[in-house]
């Protein structure tokens, strides 16, 4: 018999193709439904048009499909409710920080440029390497649509920040 905890453990082992954490810790999993030998996984993409969606779907189908008693796996992407950085688990935030990626704390004043999704707050962003607030935005565009590039003037290291969504 298939149980939800087994599926969640598998989802926690699947890395996001663009971020150094699991799809579960990134908060992409909205719901897991089990009916007999079929599993339905509902996923919230970080952005509409995310190019990693086919890879995520294939990995979920492959890994969950390897469970004993699972005969069918369906993956559905939904956009309502929208994904936000508030869905990232504390473990996910810690894992991202070890890779030099910071996450908005959810206390933003709401001052964002909706055209590019960049936080325009005046307050400094702490460096994930040395925790200094002496940081600057280098580019609102990072390696993926959901990240921006920053620089720490104290330790002289670049770092990325997830955009508040």
Language-model features, listed with the residues they occupy:
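Domain-level signature for proteins that mediate thiol-based redox and metal-cofactor handling
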Residues: 1-165
